[in-house]
């Protein structure tokens, strides 16, 4: 099994950018976009479609890349919506019981 800590590290960076926006930060640009949460939701939709196409076309390298993009943008959208990823993890854990 791979190290899942990278998701926590990415989440921490996203939280940091939300609290302290940086001019050169992609995350900050999405979170402070004039479209508000719609920008991050657009990115989730875009990356979901790209992931679906890569998986359907059985292109492993592209599927991995698009899955990473989708996970990343999902985390950004969670932050934009004020949802803590810990609550999502708790929900997943509850479903295993």
Swiss-Prot record:
> What reaction(s) does this enzyme catalyze?
1-(5-phospho-beta-D-ribosyl)-ATP + H2O = 1-(5-phospho-beta-D-ribosyl)-5'-AMP + diphosphate + H(+)
Transmembrane among keywords:
no
Known pathway: Amino-acid biosynthesis; L-histidine biosynthesis; L-histidine from 5-phospho-alpha-D-ribose 1-diphosphate: step 2/9
What Gene Ontology terms describe what this protein does at the molecular function level? Answer: ATP binding; phosphoribosyl-ATP diphosphatase activity
Q: What is its main location?
A: cytoplasm
GO BP annotations of the record are: L-histidine biosynthetic process
Which SUPFAM superfamilies does the record match to this protein? all-alpha NTP pyrophosphatases
Which top class of enzyme applies to this chain? hydrolase
* Localization terms from the record: Cytoplasm
**UniProtKB keywords:** Amino-acid biosynthesis, ATP-binding, Cytoplasm, Histidine biosynthesis, Hydrolase, Nucleotide-binding
One cellular component (GO) term of this entry? cytoplasm
Q: Which domain of life is it from?
A: Archaea
* Assigned protein family: Belongs to the PRA-PH family.
Its recorded name reads Phosphoribosyl-ATP pyrophosphatase
Record organism: Methanoculleus marisnigri (strain ATCC 35101 / DSM 1498 / JR1)
Q: Which gene encodes it?
A: hisE
